[in-house]
C-alpha cells in the first residue's frame, strides 16, 4: 500500500495499517529487517553501476576528444551531478518518502548512463558531458541508501544499519570493474564503441536498483519512523524545547557529524587521488597501482559491519577519535614510505580506507542521532552535498599541492588536518555530558 501525502501530515489519527506499526515494536522490528534486506539487494546492483562507469569515464572522454587535458572532467562532472542530486533526493525523500527519492535517483542515473552510450555512438562531446552530470544521480542514491537503513533502527542499531548498505555496495563495486573487458567486447559485438560498454552495465544496474526499491520498499520506512516519532509526544517535549510542529534538532551535533564526514572525505580523496600518480612517477606498473587502489577500496567498505558494531557499542566519541588517529597514521606512513616500497604504500592506503570508514559511519550515526525523522532526509541530503563537494575539492587541491611541492607534503598535510577531528569531537561530547 502506498502512503499518500495526506498520510504524512502530523496527525493524532493515523491510518489503521500505520497505527499497527506504531503500536507494535515487533512489527517495527520486522519492517526494519525487511527494509535492510531490500536495501542490501538494491545496493549490489547500485555498486555495479557505480564501479563500472567510473572505471572508464576518463578514458572515454579522452578517446572522444583526443586530449589528456580533459581526463579529469568526467570525474568532476559526475561528482558535481551527485552533489546536486543529493540535495534533490533528500528533499524529495522528505516529501514523498525514501522509495520515491532513492528509486528516482537510480533511475535518472541509469538514463545518464544510456545518454553516455548514445553520445559515444554519435560522437557528441556535449551530450557526453551532460549525460555524465545526470549519471551522478545514481552515485548520490548509492550513498544515501545508507540513511534509509537507519530510519527504523534504534539508537544502538543505527551505525550497524548504515554499515550494511555500505558493505553491500562493495560486492557490486568489485564485480563491475572486473567486467570492463567483457562489456567492452559485448559493446563491440553490437556496434557500440568499446569504451562505452561498461556504461551498458551501469545503466542496467542503476535501473534494476531503482526498480527494486520502487516495487519492494513498502511501506516506506521514513514515513513509518516519522509517524512513530510523532506518536511519542512525551519524548518530543523532553528534548530541548521540541514540539510536534517544531521537532527538536541538535544543530551542534549535526555540525560535528558533518565535520567528521567531510574531513575524512577530504583527506581520503586527496591522498588517494595522487597515490597512483606518485607510484607511476617512481616506476610502479599498472598492476601494482591496481593492487594498492583495490586494497584501499576494500578497506573503505569491507570493515563496515564491524565498524557499525563498534560505533554502536563504544560510542560516537571513541570511534570519531579512532577515525582521526587512523587517518593521522595513514598520512604519516604515506609521507615516510620510500617511493619504491609497495608494502608501505599498501599499508598507508589501507589505513586511509579504514579511517574514512570510521569517519563516515560515525558522522552518519551522529547526524541521525541529532535530527527528528520529520526533518531527517532533507538534512541528510544537504550534508551529502557537502560530502560530495569535499571529495571534489580534495581531488582538485591534491594535484595543486603535489605540483607545487610533493606527495610527502600532501600526506603530511592530510595527517595534520586529521588532528582537527579530535578536539572538535571532545569539545562536543564534553558539552553533552555537562548538560546531562
Curated annotation (Swiss-Prot):
InterPro entries: MFS (IPR011701), MFS_dom (IPR020846), MFS_trans_sf (IPR036259). Its main location: membrane. It is a multi-pass membrane protein. GO terms for cellular component: plasma membrane. Keywords: Cell membrane, Membrane, Transmembrane, Transmembrane helix, Transport. It comes from the Bacteria. The chain crosses the membrane at residues 38-58, 70-90, 102-122, 125-145, 160-180, 197-217, 254-274, 291-311, 319-339, 342-362, 383-403, 409-429. It is found in: Cell membrane. Disulfide bonds: none annotated. It holds the Pfam family MFS_1. One of its GO terms (molecular function) is transmembrane transporter activity. PROSITE patterns: MFS. PANTHER family: MAJOR FACILITATOR SUPERFAMILY PROTEIN, MFS PERMEASE. Belongs to the major facilitator superfamily. This is Uncharacterized MFS-type transporter YddS.
